[in-house]
Design a protein with these regions (language model features):
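Alpha-helical transmembrane-bundle signature of multi-pass membrane transport and export proteins
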Residues: 1-389
Length: 389
């Protein structure tokens, strides 16, 4: 898999930029808190990082079809590096920092959408493509675990602005890797009209195709429900008599299980079996969450979350199914929309379950999220998986 030079470049660039993104979130959160001493404003940094995915995915999704992939990916990395560099300038007011964060967030769905669209050209659709997607997800999950640790180490030795400088450099390195590691490809056919109008038209066409719509909704709503215990990690740690910092251990549970699930599903299961376990695996994601009604201790809770993460094996089958189901002329749009939608709905899930946790005990909210997830997985299950040849 990593023997393919182009995929190797995309993979390495993804590692570098993902680590940089996580470190930036930690550093900017600390910087905002240092300026304001407001926990609410510091928390808004994380929330604001998800919102642009909806706007960028909807209004800029046509970039995956209209523009040369390498040029877009490199431009996105360099623009992100420049914007983060602006955050380092002393005296930038809080509204300016948040505006810069929002602008970076608008770039992210374009980058991910174009990367998703070019991946089937680098890795032909089939087992190699599914494995490549699984490796990308593993990077994203591992970055959450490793990146927070790296962010903490950087903040221990550098100021928040110093950590942001390191992050800007990571995006610049990612851009260089892509510039010299990817082949130049022409963009799609020239279209009249604005990028936003073209993107919205593509969005309507994708959602008008019922099988594709069901796949997208499944891929968005299931993760939005799974994140409930992560959204309530700190309150749950306090609920079971642990210090709030124990939330860090809870946050490691799902990513550990998810990485294991991607390895197992992509390496050990056939394409046909990957698709057959989509719904059972999704249901496995929610079964352990019901046990939170009994207030399991810290070690057991982390174990339950790791088991829930194993249920993410459903994603391997869904990757191939989306490629086969989306109409050929809409495949790039569907792939771009899938990635942007997952990020946005996970952010919305964080907000929703966090608000619910203000009104209800955490031991009620997590099982409630599990119930909602079971309903989503059951009602939106793929009805006619594409035949494999």
């Amino acid at each position: 898999m990593l023997g393919a030079a182009e995929f190797r470049a995309i993979f390495v660039a993804n590692i570098v930029s993902m680590l940089g993104s996580v470190v930036a979130a930690v550093a900017l959160t600390v910087l905002v808190y240092q300026q304001t001493r407001s926990p609410a404003l510091a928390a808004s940094v994380m929330a604001l990082s998800f919102l642009p995915y909806l706007i960028g995915g909807a209004l800029l999704g046509a970039a995956a079809d209209r523009l040369p992939a390498r040029r877009v990916l490199v431009a996105c990395d360099l623009a992100s590096a420049a914007l983060i560099g602006c955050m380092v300038i002393p005296g930038v007011p809080l509204p300016g920092l948040l505006a810069l964060l929002f602008a970076i967030g608008l770039i992210a769905p374009v980058y991910q959408g174009v990367r998703s669209a070019v991946l089937p050209e680098v890795l032909p659709p089939g087992p190699r493509y599914v494995l490549g997607r699984a490796l990308m997800r593993m990077v994203a999950q591992s970055a959450q675990v490793v990146g927070y640790g790296v962010g903490g180490l950087l903040l221990a030795s550098l100021s928040p602005r110093g950590a942001l400088v390191a992050d800007a450099m990571s995006f610049a390195v990612s851009g260089l890797v892509l510039r010299f590691g990817m082949a130049a490809r022409p963009g799609g056919a020239t279209r009249r009209g604005s990028m936003a109008r073209d993107s919205l038209a593509g969005l309507r066409k994708v959602f008008a195709h019922r099988p594709t719509r069901r796949i997208l909704l499944f891929s968005w709503l299931v993760p939005a429900c799974v994140v409930a215990p992560e959204a309530l990690a700190a309150p749950y740690a306090t609920h079971i008599g642990q210090p709030a910092r124990a939330a860090g251990f809870l946050l490691m549970g799902l990513p550990i299980g998810t990485v294991a699930a991607d390895i197992i599903a992509a390496r050990m299961l056939t394409s046909r079996l990957q698709r057959r376990i989509i719904v059972p695996a999704a249901l496995l994601s929610f079964a352990p969450l019901a046990a939170f009604a009994g207030s399991p201790g810290l070690v057991l809770a982390v174990g339950l979350l790791a088991v829930a993460g194993l249920g993410h094996a459903w994603a391997a089958g869904m990757d191939g199914l989306l490629i086969d189901t989306a109409p050929s002329g809409l495949r790039n749009r569907a792939l771009a929309l899938a990635g942007a939608g997952i990020m946005f709905t996970q952010g919305a899930g964080f907000a929703l379950w966090g608000i619910a946790g203000q009104c209800l005990p955490v031991t009620v909210v997590v099982p409630l999220a599990a119930t909602a997830g079971v309903l989503a997985a059951t009602l939106l299950r793929p009805r006619r998986p594409a035949r494999l040849t």
